[in-house]
Amino acid sequence: SFTTKALLVTQQLTLEKIQIRTASVPLNRPIVAKVGQLKDWPLILIDIYTKEGVVGRSYLEPYRQRSVAAIVHSIQDLADMFKGKPLAPLDVYAESMRSLHLVGREGITLIALAGIDMAIWDALAKAANKPLATLLGGSPGPIRAYNTNGLWLKPLDELADEAAALVEEGNYSAVKMRLGRETIQQDAQAIAIVRE
C-alpha cells in the first residue's frame, strides 16, 4: 500500500514556521479569456521551515488577484494546525480534510492545502538528498514540454504569428491553445490556423 512510511527513508521533519509571500508578475502576453483579460499573474510563494533546518518551497498560481488574500489566510490557518508536528504528507492531508469538513473541501481551501502539500514534499526530498521523482519511486529524466504562454482567445488574424513566436521562444515542438470562442466553427478555424 501507498504509505508515507513506506516511501520515506529519511529523517522526520517537524514544522517550525511557514512564510508566505505574494507577487504579481507582469505578463509578456496578456491573457484574453472568457473570464476577462489579465495583464499580471498573481503568485503565492510558500516556504515551510522545519526544526531540522530544511526548507520546503512551493508556489501557487491562483489566476485571480482577488482570491490571493483568502488563499493566504487559508494556508496560514492550515499551517498553524501542524506547527510543532511531524510533516508526513498523507497525515497532513487526512487531518486537513477532517478539519475542513465544515467549511468545505474544495476551492480556496483545497488550493491552500495543495501549496502546503507541495512544500512538504519538497522538504522531504531535500532532507533525503534525492530528486522528488526518485523519492516517489520514479526516475528523473527529460519530459516533452510545450509553450503555454499565449494563444488565448485573440482575434484569428493574430494566431499564426503568435504560434510561430511561441515555438521559437524555447525551441518548443508544441504549444497550448485555448478554445471557447463564440462558435465551434471559430474554434475549428483557430485550430487550423495554428496547425499551419
Segments predicted by a language model, with ranges:
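N-terminal accessory beta-strand-rich subdomains and adjacent acidic, glycine-rich linkers
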Residues: A6-L7, S24, Q37, A70-H73, ...
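Structured beta-strand/loop patches that form or line metal/cofactor-binding pockets in enzymes
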Residues: L8-E52, R57, E61-Y63
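Metal- or metallocofactor-binding catalytic centers and their adjacent structured scaffolds
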Residues: Q12, K17, Y49-A127
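Short glycine/proline-enriched loop/turn "hinge" motifs that connect secondary-structure elements
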Residues: L38, L136-G138, V167
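Conserved active-site and cofactor/substrate-binding residues in soluble primary-metabolism enzymes
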Residues: W41, R66-A69, H73, L87, ...
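Glycine-rich, aromatic-flanked loop segments that form ligand/cofactor-binding clefts
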Residues: D117-L153
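Metal-dependent enolase-superfamily TIM-barrel catalytic cores that perform enediolate-based chemistry
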Residues: G141-E196
